[in-house]
Amino acid sequence: MVSSNFYKNLGPRKLTAIIDFLHDIIEPTKIHEDIDIHDIKILQEASPNDISFLSNPKYSEFLKTTKAAACIVPKDFTEESNQNTVLIHAENSYFAYSKLIDFFYAPIKSYSTKIMKSAIIADSAAIGKNCYIGHNVVIEDDVIIGDNSIIDAGTFIGRGVNIGKNARIEQHVSINYAIIGDDVVILVGAKIGQDGFGFATEKGVHNKIFHIGIVKIGNNVEIGSNTTIDRGALQDTIIEDLCRIDNLVQIGHGVKIGKGSIIVAQAGIAGSSAIGKYCALGGQVGIAGHLNIGDRTQVAAQGGVAQNIEEGKIVGGSPAVPIMDWHRQSIIMKQLVKTSNNKLKK
């Protein structure tokens, strides 16, 4: 249930208006009646004035009984459905749903062009036009913040940091030694630009290595809550354009993340490894240091990568192996356990 405490419903919307809004990502759709659509709901909860979506075939059975006025479905969907539900076919129904959410809802909380009195901003800092600077924000010397940016309460931005236009930086974020592009979102509690875990050991003494690199983050990047991105020791840590990084991810010093890559929660990437473009790392994946992971690589959840991976490979397990080998290993292990248990019973 969508709470009106936090989100504003922009509806009702005419069904024809919805179809027109999504026209470039859906198939042409004919309707018999142009009704008001009040909300977006899951198939099981939708009423005759709601729209829904289907992206996971596990839920296709609910299309037979749903009361939804309309439903966005995959392009090739041909299964039985409620005759009263208008089916809107899309190449990617989940992507269409993500666009529809923007058409129906907006956050209640809004940010005016304002600098709160409790914010501490150095005289040499340059704040762009139409920015919001929240309570207890600290912005140090020579910081540059682009136009239309939001810096929310309790955030710290260290000396010399450069942040592009249209940034949204949420509460209690800290940013040091970083250059950040346009249209970047950094969620609550993320830490960027701190020292990496670098020590030189001699006779039991761990001598800390002074890190003189920075963090470079491209355009249209999202970084999740409590994620940490260390600055480089010599080489910079680089996050290229269009990356999506989930909560609680650790990115070590000197790591490079290629354009459009996705990294899911609790993954960790050790120092100086390079992740290619459009890669996907599942939850709790671990990448050892000084490795090269090819473009469009996928690593299944909890995979442990200890060697280089060629472009386009799908791997899983720890140590990570080709995904089909991992499945075979899992089957063999189950068979061994079953055989062993049978012998013990005898």
From Swiss-Prot:
One Gene Ontology term, aspect cellular component: membrane
Catalytic activity: a UDP-3-O-[(3R)-3-hydroxyacyl]-alpha-D-glucosamine + a (3R)-hydroxyacyl-[ACP] = a UDP-2-N,3-O-bis[(3R)-3-hydroxyacyl]-alpha-D-glucosamine + holo-[ACP] + H(+)
Subunit structure: Homotrimer.
EC number: 2.3.1.191
Active site (UniProt): H253
Pathway annotation: Bacterial outer membrane biogenesis; LPS lipid A biosynthesis
Entry-linked NCBIfam families: lipid_A_lpxD, PRK00892.1
Group of enzyme by EC: transferase
One example GO MF annotation: N-acyltransferase activity
InterPro entries cross-referenced by the UniProt entry: Hexapep (IPR001451), Hexapep_transf_CS (IPR018357), LpxD (IPR007691), Trimer_LpxA-like_sf (IPR011004), UDP_GlcNAc_AcTrfase_non-rep (IPR020573)
Protein name in UniProt: UDP-3-O-acylglucosamine N-acyltransferase
Biological role: Catalyzes the N-acylation of UDP-3-O-acylglucosamine using 3-hydroxyacyl-ACP as the acyl donor. Is involved in the biosynthesis of lipid A, a phosphorylated glycolipid that anchors the lipopolysaccharide to the outer membrane of the cell.
One of the GO biological process terms: lipid A biosynthetic process
Keywords: Acyltransferase, Lipid A biosynthesis, Lipid biosynthesis, Lipid metabolism, Repeat, Transferase
SUPFAM superfamilies assigned: Trimeric LpxA-like enzymes
Superkingdom: Bacteria
Family membership: Belongs to the transferase hexapeptide repeat family. LpxD subfamily.
Keyword Repeat: yes
Record-linked HAMAP family: LpxD
Organism per entry: Rickettsia typhi (strain ATCC VR-144 / Wilmington)
